[in-house]
From Swiss-Prot:
This is U3-myrmicitoxin-Tb1a. The keyword ATP-binding does not apply. GO terms for molecular function: sodium channel regulator activity; toxin activity. It comes from Tetramorium bicarinatum. Vertebrate selective toxin that causes pain by targeting tetrodotoxin (TTX)-sensitive sodium channels in peripheral sensory neurons. Converts the normally rapidly activating and inactivating sodium channel current into one that does not inactivate. Is active on both Nav1.6/SCN8A and Nav1.7/SCN9A, with a much potent activity on Nav1.6/SCN8A (EC(50)=196 nM on human channels) than on Nav1.7/SCN9A (EC(50)=1.9 uM on human and EC(50)=1.2 uM on mouse channels). Expressed by the venom gland. Its main location: secreted. It is found in: Secreted. Residues 24-49 form a propeptide. The modification Asparagine amide is found at residue 72.
Length: 73
């Protein structure tokens, strides 16, 4: 019974602390814009990294098709 009471209190505390964090006046008002900018930067970096390897990746992805054609005619 003590464990259930402890878990109940812990869930309430975690829930309240989460809601207080979102309602805090020091919360970042531009959080969505910042997250979008960060995601765009990551997408651009990944695209720049993958672009030189794209022909190699395309060749490797066609290997199962070629093997099937060679073995099954």
């Amino acid at each position: 019974m003590k464990v259930l009471k402890f878990l109940f209190i812990a869930v309430i505390i975690v829930g309240l602390s989460g809601s207080l964090t979102w309602a805090s006046p020091i919360a970042n008002a531009r959080a969505e814009a910042d997250a979008e900018a960060a995601a765009e930067a990551v997408a651009k970096a990944v695209a720049e990294a993958v672009l030189p390897a794209l022909p190699l990746l395309a060749g490797l992805m066609s290997l199962p098709f070629l093997q099937h054609k060679l073995t099954n005619g």
